[in-house]
Amino acid sequence: MIFCLSSGQTPMAFRLPVVAEPEMPAGTDVSSTGRLPRWLKRPIPKSNSNHLTDSLMEEYGLETVCDNAKCPNRMECYSQQTATFMVLGNVCTRPCGFCAVSRGRPPAAPAVDEPDRIAKAAERLGLKHVVITSVTRDDLPDGGADHFHNCVIAVRERTGATTEVLTPDFVHCKEALARVIEAKPTVFNHNMETVPRLYRRVRGPKSDYAWTLEMMRQVKRYDAEVKTKSGLMLGLGEERGELLDALSDLREHDVDFLTLGQYLQPGEKYLPVVRYVPPEEFDELADIAKSMGFKKVASGPFVRSSYHARDMAETE
């Protein structure tokens, strides 16, 4: 077993500036009425598959990040019989300012049969690409790395599907990261989320921009065949130059795939939206990112980490 995490551990000497409340940039589409711009309004898909996906999650006692994080795409994904499995419970030990997942002290140890239940549900849904994410578990000695490992193995052995893990940061533990990569997921994903200036404000006091980048480089050192992926939310007050610098940092650290999406405030107690980014700007950013060398880019208002993840995983 890996024992390398402690609640007070902060091994990397990377200092971020104290962040003031961001000023609203010119041209913003945030209105005083709180109404969404037209491009963020769309019909809710209706399909019997919505019920099938929901019922299977309930039958196998599984959580999805789709529901817990109030993802705007969940009905679309459910209608296509896809979902992102959320392991290690539904209570997170990190207080990220953007995330709707419950936070606090997790009530239970990892369920040893969860990998098998995920594999069975994936088989019933006929999934060809399975995405597995988790809450952050700073209370576990390995941050849940061994559980990720077991989930990937179980899914691959039962279904033959490609796999994608969207992991927490494991509090700078390279041994934990190596344990996940030993399982040979098709794609390793860890989200940058925002630019350095806003990092602690958005991701909390334990977050570390430098370690996020180092994780990506380490993955390639452990297994060069594993594809790496990261993403950022836009509309939190980042400036254009800061965003492009962050994308450049990701490419310099061997990130293959990139996602860019609009941050949407999940409730009143979360970080406010500073700006709604128009679709044409997302398109422009996609072109810039591709010119930087990203192998695949998904950029748009509704893009999220695992949205149409199979399409990205199949890209060479």
From Swiss-Prot:
GO cellular component: cytoplasm
Residues reported to bind [4Fe-4S] cluster 2: C92, C96, C99
Substrates-to-products reaction catalysed: [[Fe-S] cluster scaffold protein carrying a second [4Fe-4S](2+) cluster] + N(6)-octanoyl-L-lysyl-[protein] + 2 oxidized [2Fe-2S]-[ferredoxin] + 2 S-adenosyl-L-methionine + 4 H(+) = [[Fe-S] cluster scaffold protein] + N(6)-[(R)-dihydrolipoyl]-L-lysyl-[protein] + 4 Fe(3+) + 2 hydrogen sulfide + 2 5'-deoxyadenosine + 2 L-methionine + 2 reduced [2Fe-2S]-[ferredoxin]
Annotated [4Fe-4S] cluster 1 binding sites: C66, C71, C77, S306
UniProt-listed NCBIfam families: lipA, PRK05481.1, PRK12928.1
Family to which this protein belongs: Belongs to the radical SAM superfamily. Lipoyl synthase family.
Protein name, per record: Lipoyl synthase
Organism for this UniProt entry: Rhodopirellula baltica (strain DSM 10527 / NCIMB 13988 / SH1)
Lineage of source species: Bacteria, Pseudomonadati, Planctomycetota, Planctomycetia, Pirellulales
